């Protein structure tokens, strides 16, 4: 951890709740590093914010597909500008309307959609917060959860993320992250290098983001358009 004589930045540490973490190991590491800002447990059960569950599932899918989050979403949304239908590719076993309606069932249903549900949620979340917050959370998560042995390639990826969002005066610098990343003399290394920084950034995502997404025009207009199209086809 990078320590400085000036601790004024600690005033910016938000009140952290268990719902801001995906696992207990993250809570333990946070409490170890910030004993004066320990995680508050509101309930007996560890219930993570719905939006973090969705982002986690997106990151895991990206790892499985072996493609970077930013590149994949950029490609999908770029194609959508030319042809909205390009977002919605799936087997004919389930209709587009059925899939979009299923997004209301649970965060898992939204994340599992191959019709573009997760991409639209990411777009909505960036509008609510910032591109930097969402991209850092996803990229640091993919780095953390990729099951590869420590090595030069992994260290290079950690350095890339660090240089992109944390180091010095980088264009996409996120305030205070430098104090929350575990950096040795060799640089940012190790699976948990971004574990506290990721949790900190996650606090910027509103607890009710998933619910707001389902009430937002970005979703409601899409559902209306698809429902209208289905009606016309059946006439």
Swiss-Prot record:
The keyword Methyltransferase does not apply. The keyword Nuclease does not apply. Keywords: Signal transduction inhibitor. InterPro entries: RGS, RGS_sf, RGS_subdom1/3, RGS_subdomain_2. It comes from the Eukaryota. Residues 107-223 form the RGS domain. GO terms for biological process: negative regulation of signal transduction. Signal peptide: none annotated. PANTHER family: REGULATOR OF G PROTEIN SIGNALING (PTHR10845), RGS DOMAIN-CONTAINING PROTEIN-RELATED (PTHR10845:SF259). This is Regulator of G-protein signaling rgs-9.
